[in-house]
Regions:
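Surface loop/turn motifs at the tips and blade-to-blade linkers of beta-strand repeat domains
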Residues: 73-77, 115-119, 160-167, 216-220, ...
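Beta-propeller domain segments
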Residues: 56-64, 172, 189-192, 206-212, ...
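Beta-rich catalytic cores
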Residues: 79, 119-122, 129, 171, ...
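Conserved beta-propeller blade signature
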Residues: 90-93, 132-135, 182-186, 235-239, ...
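A short loop-to-beta-strand structural motif that recurs across blades of beta-propeller domains
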Residues: 99-101, 140-142, 203-205, 254, ...
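Asp-box/WD-like beta-propeller blade repeats and closely related beta-sheet repeat scaffolds
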Residues: 140-178
Length: 400
């Protein structure tokens, strides 16, 4: 009997566990529910040693434009979320289950896999700068120095800051360094919709690499899980997830653009750029806030995004924005579960979106994967992380 290698096995087991129990670790789950699902999980784990190898991920179901190809780079990264690449070709991957992973890459293949740390509180975001790996962990930002040369024996992390909000609802944080050398850190709203301190929640902030000189960059942002800087204008662009419980088709997720510090994007008063909040929007018209560049659709859960500047894809893709849509969880008919691209003029104007990769959502609303982040590579390929399948995919192009 052939058994799966441990990382791949537990990735598949996680998917089986979710499918059987309907459980996924999110804020607000009761203690009784956790206990019940953990008992079921324990039963599954006891049977793990005797389970045969399970089917590989159905990657051939993914539809792409002509000439594009997708393959599984790794299925040994459970709950894979944010990605960051070092100049040495080491891919760092955050997760929702306490681990941070490193994949050594060569010629588009994984040559080694490492666990950098474990037991952290939702270390979803990772960023690399000057030889160090920065990791978000809800209220903390940690730094692992000289990490590229210590993958097998990672150093003890340095606490960059431990003063971020402790709330776990929208508490996971995508992080990235901007062209100004600052570390950008979002602080999501601790709720579906609520009026909290707007200097503490619903914003993007930035700080020096050592954690000093923190300042708010933009407000009125419910929950951004992806941002990047335009390769020509160097302006900050970011996704934002719209509120829930207003219906299947409102409000839209947004792609926003912040060319200067201090802009307000409306939350909790206005959603999707044109939908007043029924509770908080009465005295705050949507016209008072910065509208989105693109309305991405309701409940698609737009997460990671990057500008594509590589040369492998056709020229029409250069400077496009790729966005990972994690997919809906509270809509009567599921949407998202795909990767889209946003096309703009060279200055970022006239933006519109097109579907790039789809097939994680199958007919009958069966889901086998959920894109979480995207990462362009130096060779021009594009990586996609998937926290549901515990995988990273690699997209390439060759002339049809």
């Amino acid at each position: 009997m052939k058994l799966l290698p441990p990382p791949a096995f537990f990735s598949v087991l996680r998917a089986v566990f979710r499918r059987i129990t309907g459980f996924s670790p999110v804020a607000g789950v009761s203690g009784a529910a956790r206990a019940r699902t953990l008992r079921i999980g324990a039963t599954l784990l006891l049977a793990a040693a005797t389970l045969p190898a399970l089917a590989a991920l159905p990657i051939k179901r993914i539809k792409l434009p002509p000439g594009f190809h997708i393959e599984v780079l790794s299925e040994a990264v459970p709950s894979a979320r944010g990605m960051a690449l070092s100049p040495k070709g080491i891919l760092y991957i955050g997760s929702l289950d306490g681990h941070v992973y490193a994949l050594e890459l060569r010629d588009g293949h994984v040559t080694a896999r490492h666990v950098i740390t474990s037991g952290l509180e939702t270390p979803a975001g990772v960023a690399w700068r000057d030889g160090a790996l920065y990791v978000s962990a809800v209220s903390k930002i940690l730094r692992f120095d000289a990490i590229d040369t210590h993958l097998s024996d990672p150093p003890k992390p340095v606490i960059v800051t431990d003063t971020l909000p402790t709330e776990t609802h929208h508490g996971w944080k995508f992080i990235a360094f901007g062209p100004d050398g600052k570390l950008y850190v979002p602080q999501g709203a601790p709720c579906n919709v609520c009026l909290k301190d707007r200097d503490r929640f619903g914003l993007i902030g930035r700080m020096n690499p050592d954690g000093s000189h923190y300042e708010v960059v933009a407000r009125g942002i419910r929950n951004t899980v992806g941002f990047a800087w335009h390769p020509v204008t160097h302006e900050l662009w970011f996704t934002d997830n719209g509120r829930d419980l207003m219906g299947d088709d409102v409000p839209d997720d947004k792609l926003n653009r912040a060319p200067r510090v201090g802009m307000d994007f409306g939350f909790p008063y206005c959603h999707g750029g044109d939908t007043p909040d029924p509770e908080f929007g009465k005295d705050h018209p949507c016209s008072a806030f910065t509208p989105p560049v693109v309305k991405l659709g309701a409940h698609v859960a737009s997460l990671g995004m990057r500008f594509y500047t590589g040369s492998m894809f056709p020229g029409a893709y250069r400077d496009n924005i790729f966005i990972a849509e994690h997919g809906s969880w509270n809509r009567s008919k599921k949407v998202g579960y795909r990767v889209v691209r946003v096309i703009t003029n060279p200055d970022g104007s006239n933006a519109h979106q097109e579907v790039f990769a789809e097939g994680w959502l199958q007919p009958g609303e069966t889901v086998w994967g959920r894109p979480a982040d995207v990462q362009p590579m130096p060779d021009g390929s594009l990586l996609i992380s998937d926290d549901y399948a515990g995988a990273v995919y690699r997209v390439t192009y060759s002339t049809p």
